[in-house]
Amino acid sequence: MRTVKLIVCILFFAVCAFFSLGTLITGSSVITEGGIEKPRLITETGVNRNFGNEYEEYFSRAFAYRRYVVDAWSALRVNLLHEGNDQVVVGKNGYLFFADTIDAYTGLNPMTDEEIAKAADSLLALQTYANEHGAKFCFLPAPDKNTIFPENMPSRYMRAKTTDLDRLLAALDERGVTYSDPREALTAAKSEKIYYKTDTHWTPDGAELAFALTADKLGVQMFDTNTVGRVGEAIQGDLNTLLYPGQTLTESVMTADFSDSFIYTSAFSTPMDMVITSRGGGHGKALVFRDSFCNALLGLVSSTFSETQFERANPFRLDLLGTSKADYVIVEIAERNLRNLIGSDERIKEVID
């Protein structure tokens, strides 16, 4: 018995030593979550009294070969238990879902009636301000993937009969706020690849379906993607990356080739730039407030208008209407983030006050 205990102890300390000393090997430790720095016991101000907690956090994210350990653990959970991690839900037929969408899907922790009213009032204020400055307004909620593909969710999650999005759109109807609801169109097209299996977002084709409804609400002629060719596009699914940080797994789709239909006029770096401006061959100027779901719309929207300005800041900078002279205002936001609409009109309140 003592021999067994000794072997277990030796193995335990050997594993700890391997991962600890392994951090000294160049390339063995790669931090991908937030860029945390190695803490110091002695700082410019003296002894770091929080060194223990800081080093514990650092080591948990920087121990040697962490990515491969996480990959192996995820593979075991996915293949044996059909489970992901605290950020990823493993669904059916190869679908992965973002864990942050579960509350919206199940109705757990729903928005209160007061929150719904505040979100709707903010959108009404945004629309009123846009109209007063000569711009048409449309709100575009981007449905969570499990809203469109509930059949691929694990059976343990029960879908809510009435969602926050249902309630918000009803409140917008009462207030006369213009919106486009793409859920029906996306559901009807679900046999096509309109959402990525391994990513949170819709594909370019799914995004096009949603924007077609928005353009119709605004009375705009959407750019005809049939007039350009199609090219292959491979993305590294964000959900796959959260499950398997040590692997480079891609998912491919076909998308319209917008290379000759618009140009970026800002110093474009990535689709997640805080501000992006573009010039296309369409008519009118657009001001678009958006999140990551709009990444798949950059080319299409830019090609539809003569000038477009995309903004990621919230509260929304609708005060820019004073200088941009936009003809159209679009507010796009993911279904899971509807609470972020509350107070999104603060910037125009400052201008009015």
Each model region followed by its residue ranges:
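Extracellular glycan-modifying ectodomains
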Residues: 1-353
